[in-house]
Regions:
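Extracellular/periplasmic, surface-exposed regions of secreted and cell-surface proteins
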Residues: 1-217, 362-425
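Extracytoplasmic gating/loop element in the C-terminal half of outer-membrane beta-barrel translocons
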Residues: 3, 247-249, 302-385, 390
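Conserved small-residue
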Residues: 57-66, 175-276, 336
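Short glycine/proline-rich turn/loop motifs
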Residues: 91-94, 262-267, 352-360
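Conserved active-site-proximal loop/helix segments of enzymes involved in bacterial cell-wall
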Residues: 139-142, 263-265, 313
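C-terminal extracellular loops and terminal segments
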Residues: 152-162, 204-220, 271-283, 315-329
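Glycine-rich, aromatic-lined ligand/substrate-binding cores of catalytic
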Residues: 273-308
Length: 425
């Protein structure tokens, strides 16, 4: 493969792959079992995949081997014989330094699978996969300030990560007679990942390191919450919370992990090994056919997933939002001084409540769900088909603030009903 994003001499790289399979059911010794297991194949593959899709959104430039200099973007100075004749000059600024010794990012991919057919009705597929990714482009974190790079910290290929999991699917088709038949299908995927090598600062506390933990989006970091403050006296006798607003009764109380008497970002830690990206995804559906009629349903869902709602729910004013009734009814107040209230106190400005919007166990929610995705009834005739379809019919989830499959700012999925005709000529 070749790319223009890399310097000459590193633009082309070879990425080999190999695969092998054995159809065991084709062997003579399998003949006694063929009426039960009519097909069995064991397969495996290993290969290297390259990518030049460095993290553009994260700050890398398209041509990573060039410095980025902005004329007139730096500091300024006055020159001239007198104040009335001075001339203001602005120098250039370095917004990004070239990354040296840059290559393709690589993923070494291993897959081992089995394909199985039982009684000429049931098809089963299983895959185990493991990916090892290296040369990940990351902004250097362990970079001494004495080097003087200011706001243009270099990027380098210093990251390594691992992704591992398995996929399973099963499909069953059965013709009971000329009139009746059934198709049943299901799938299940589990995946997990972690940083193998991550450029990090020399943190003071061990819980601040991310190496060995799931990657961003697959975990949640935040503060550990001990409840809500009940009184000014409790606030005075607790660690000082330096999170933007002065704590008041009804505000969230955080745990001082390092014991220094202050709540700062040094007290943030891993609060869930699951993030908004699910580890588990699954789906199941069935189609029944009777003569010219067919009826199909499909469900999908995900698990091992959490949602952080702290700053997203934002019921705290100064954003032109209406206050939801369920928040008002379940908030901490003088009339409801419950240290385990579902929502902290309300206020008249967002700046007065920034203490309560930090990522924490208080705002962590279980994001698993099951969705009734589709229901379709159809009638087939000689030249086509008539059908009625419903999509996104229901969702079951412990998370009830918005659609658990979406972000809070995403346009919601619509429940739709369709009446259609398909014609064949």
């Amino acid at each position: 493969n070749g790319t223009e994003r890399l310097p000459e001499g590193d633009r082309f790289e070879f990425f080999p792959a190999v695969s092998v399979g054995w159809a065991v059911s084709n062997e003579k010794f399998w003949e006694p079992l063929r009426n039960y297991v009519d097909f069995l194949k064991i397969r495996g593959s290993y290969g290297i995949v390259g990518s030049d899709g460095f993290d553009d959104a994260g700050g890398t430039r398209h041509f990573v081997y060039f410095d980025q200099i902005v004329i007139g973007g730096g500091g300024g100075y006055n020159s001239g014989p007198s104040p009335s004749q001075q001339y203001w000059s602005v120098g250039p600024a370095v917004n990004g330094y070239a990354s040296s010794n840059v290559h393709w990012e690589r993923v070494k991919k291993l897959d081992i699978g089995v394909d199985l057919s039982l009684f000429r009705q049931v098809n089963i597929t299983f895959d185990y996969f493991k990916d090892k990714r290296d040369r990940i482009m990351m902004m250097r974190a362990n970079w001494p300030e004495i080097f003087g790079y200011f706001n243009a910290i270099p990027w380098g290929q210093v990251g390594k990560a691992e992704n591992e999991g398995y996929e399973f699917s099963i499909n069953w088709h059965k013709d009971f007679n000329r009139d009746w038949s059934i198709d049943l299908r299901s799938s299940f995927t589990y995946t997990k990942n972690k940083f193998i090598d991550k450029d990090e600062p020399n943190y003071t506390y061990p819980w601040q390191y991310k190496q060995g933990l799931p990657m961003d989006g697959y975990r949640c970091d935040g503060y550990v919450v001990e409840g809500l403050f009940k009184s000014d006296e409790e606030i005075a006798n607790s660690p000082e919370q330096l999170l933007g607003s002065t704590p008041r009764p009804g505000d969230i109380k955080y745990r001082d992990l390092n014991g220094d008497g202050k709540i700062t970002p040094d007290d943030m830690t891993l609060i869930s090994e699951y993030g908004w990206r699910p580890r588990i995804q699954y789906g199941a559906g069935v189609t029944l056919r009777w003569r010219q009629w067919d009826l199909g349903v499909f469900f999908n869902g995900s698990g091992n997933r959490t949602i952080m709602v702290g700053n997203d729910i934002a019921p705290f004013g100064e954003r032109n939002h209406n206050l939801m009734q369920f928040i008002a009814d379940n908030r901490w107040s003088a009339d409801n001084p419950d240290p385990k209230a579902k929502y902290p106190r309300l206020g008249v400005s967002h700046a007065d409540l920034t203490n309560n919007t930090a990522a924490s166990t208080y705002w962590l929610r279980n994001g698993r769900f099951i969705r009734f995705k589709t229901l379709e009834l159809g009638y087939n005739f000689k030249y086509g088909r008539v059908y009625v379809n419903g999509d996104n019919l229901a969702v079951w989830s412990p998370f009830d603030l918005w659609d658990p499959e979406l972000n809070w700012y995403t346009y919601p999925l619509q429940r739709t009903f369709t009446l259609g005709v398909q014609l064949k000529f």
